[in-house]
Amino acid sequence: MRLLQFFLGGMFLASAMSVFAAADAERGKALTLVCTACHGQDGNSVVGTYPNIAGQNEQYLLKQMLDIKSKARSAPLMAGILDNLDEQQLENIAAYYSEQKLSSGSVDPKLVELGETIYRSGIKRKEIAACSACHAPDGSGNGPAAFPVLSGQWPEYTVAQLKAFRSGERHNDGDARMMRITSMDLSDHEIEAVASYLFGLH
C-alpha cells in the first residue's frame, strides 16, 4: 500500500510541475556572491554541512529557494538572504548553478554495498521504494519533476536531510509526502549507507 501511495504521489507531482520562464545564467552568476561563503564559487561547497549545488536540477533549486524564502522550508542559515530577490532573480541563480560541474567524491567502502542495495532496490520488507525510481539510477534526478540530483552530495548533508524528513522537521515534499513516507522507517545506519553510496555515485 505504501509503495502504491509513493508512486501515485510521484506521478501527481511530476504532472503538476509548471514550466518556468526562461532564465539567464549570466545574470544569475552576478547574484551569487553571497552564496559563495557556504556553497563555494561554483556551487561545490568545501564543508559537508553545506550542500553541493553545482549541477543541481534547475527547477529543484528554484523550488527550494522559493520554499526557504516563504518559510515553507526551514533553513536558519539562509534566513533573510533571499528576501530581496524576486522570482526571476532566483530563476537566474538556479540556472547558473545548474550549469556548473559537480566535483567528484570518495566513499566509505564499508557502507557502499548496503547503500547501493537500498538506492537501487529499496527495502521490500519495510515497503520502502527504491530511491532510483525518482532520482534515476545514476542519481541525476528528474529535472521536469523537480526531483533533485543526489550523486556527489556530501554525506553529512544527505544524512541531515533524510533525518529531517523522517522526523517531519522538513516537510516541503508536497502533499504526496514522498520523502517523509520513504524515510520514516529508515534506520540511522541505512540512512548513512545511502548517503555514503550517493557521494561516490557518478
Predicted regions and their residues:
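Electrostatic cytochrome c docking/interface patches
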Residues: 17-32, 46-49, 99-125
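The feature marks the first
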Residues: 25, 29-71
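Sequence context surrounding c-type heme c attachment/ligation sites in exported
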Residues: 26-33, 58, 62-63, 120-132, ...
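Axial heme c-ligation environment in periplasmic c-type cytochrome domains
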Residues: 46-52, 67-110, 143-149, 168-201
